[in-house]
């Protein structure tokens, strides 16, 4: 059991140290207005190439810092909360996979790589919700997975629509999206995807169901990953939504969700 406890503590210290480092770096990026855009050519075959892009600015670094901070605290809490669990190794690895999927989503300015992180969140979320392997967990996991599939379909439609413009790097088209009705459709689809991840009405039913997972998982799912993924996407597409009636619609839906959550509490 000492080995398992050390395994949790190693993950805690590792994530906490990276979180503090990223927070300090994000402050430097914010004050000096630095942005790093990195392209990594994974495969090149004659005229075809597969390029992975990463965007490092103060916003992405600060979000990664907060995600790692909350995740490290959840793992530290799991050290004692799940001390008697025989599968705690598997549990910690699933949580770390969750964090990696979220970081993949945050640093990607490309809708394809965002979809990889997005589906990674959905898959690991399903594995965590059904962790206890009983009928209640299976039903909750299926509800969580199916609710988030709607957002996946919306993101796939946005990817298909961006084929018209020759690139999936949405970061280059944000100014164009403000004045182009067709590009606003992409913003609307991304907003629909964010609503499913953030459990807004009418997709909020999966959030109480996710409590079938172990308590640390529920805290992680609710606070630092799934909900934050939707919020982060909306922040990136903020310029598009602010010039459209969808912003008022989103405000209404979020207000209704808060009201319903208050009644439920």
Curated annotation (Swiss-Prot):
Enzyme Commission identifier(s): 7.1.1.2
Reactions listed under catalytic activity: a ubiquinone + NADH + 5 H(+)(in) = a ubiquinol + NAD(+) + 4 H(+)(out)
Compartments, record wording: Mitochondrion inner membrane
Record-linked InterPro entries: ND/Mrp_TM, NU5C-like, Proton_antipo_N
Keywords: Electron transport, Membrane, Mitochondrion, Mitochondrion inner membrane, NAD, Respiratory chain, Translocase, Transmembrane, Transmembrane helix, Transport, Ubiquinone
Catalytic EC class: translocase
A Gene Ontology BP annotation from the UniProt entry: ATP synthesis coupled electron transport
GO cellular component terms, semicolon-separated: mitochondrial inner membrane
Pfam families named in the record: Proton_antipo_M, Proton_antipo_N
Effect of residue 32 to M: In strain: Chil
Keyword set includes Electron transport: yes
Residue intervals passing through the bilayer: 10-30, 50-70, 92-112, 113-133, 153-173, 183-203, 215-235, 244-264
Keyword Mitochondrion: yes
GO molecular function, one term: NADH dehydrogenase (ubiquinone) activity
Stated family: Belongs to the complex I subunit 5 family.
Described function: Core subunit of the mitochondrial membrane respiratory chain NADH dehydrogenase (Complex I) that is believed to belong to the minimal assembly required for catalysis. Complex I functions in the transfer of electrons from NADH to the respiratory chain. The immediate electron acceptor for the enzyme is believed to be ubiquinone.
Protein's name in the database: NADH-ubiquinone oxidoreductase chain 5
Organism this protein belongs to: Anopheles quadriannulatus
